[in-house]
From Swiss-Prot:
Taxonomic source organism: Escherichia coli O6:H1 (strain CFT073 / ATCC 700928 / UPEC)
Annotated HAMAP family: UPF0208
GO cellular component, one term: plasma membrane
Superkingdom classification of source: Bacteria
Record topological domains on the Cytoplasmic side: 1-45, 92-151
Protein name, as recorded: UPF0208 membrane protein YfbV
Membrane topology of the entry: Multi-pass membrane protein
Segments traversing the membrane: 46-65, 69-91
Keyword Transferase: no
Topological domain ranges for the Periplasmic compartment: 66-68
Location(s) in or outside the cell: Cell inner membrane
UniProt xrefs under InterPro entries: UPF0208
Length: 151
């Protein structure tokens, strides 16, 4: 995945963008066959919730049983890195430009929103997945589900 040249994205801002993208993306079942975001967001949320306690449990278990500290720390760090990997991936995905097939569909959905009387801000530059997430979220609130039939 490549990032657009007009946006400066540093390593740590990708985590914030990933968090925002996961909150913006509509978790609709009809989008799951086309976009992998549904699975990644669900697994990232699961990892954010359960991996820190698993890391603490792993450390305590190894120390209580007299195990070596090195493998326990490595296992705990791996468990703690899983949510970060998900957020990083979502952040990278959010700034990735849309491929041509999805770009056409993006403009069709925007057109349907404008036809229904919604006021939309003009698209600046090449649209990315974050713009798609914002548009889809608004479309699911404002339009009926038939706009997905063209997907």
């Amino acid at each position: 995945m490549s990032t657009p040249d007009n946006r400066s994205v540093n390593f740590f801002s990708l985590f914030c963008r990933g968090q925002h993208y996961s909150k913006t993306w509509p978790l609709e079942k009809r989008l799951a066959p086309v976009f992998v975001e549904n699975r990644v967001i669900k697994m990232t949320r699961y990892a954010i919730r359960f991996m820190p306690p698993i890391a603490v449990f792993t450390l305590c278990w190894q120390i209580a049983l007299g195990g070596q500290l090195g493998p326990a720390v490595a296992t705990a760090l791996f468990a703690l890195s899983l949510p970060m990997q998900g957020l990083w991936w979502l952040g990278k995905r959010s700034v990735t430009p849309l491929p041509p097939a999805i770009l056409n569909w993006f403009y069709e959905v925007r057109g349907k929103l404008q036809e229904s009387g919604q006021v939309l801000a003009p698209v600046e530059g090449k649209p990315d997945y974050q713009a798609l997430a914002d548009t889809l979220k608004r479309a699911f609130k404002q339009l009926d589900k038939t706009f997905l039939d063209d997907l």
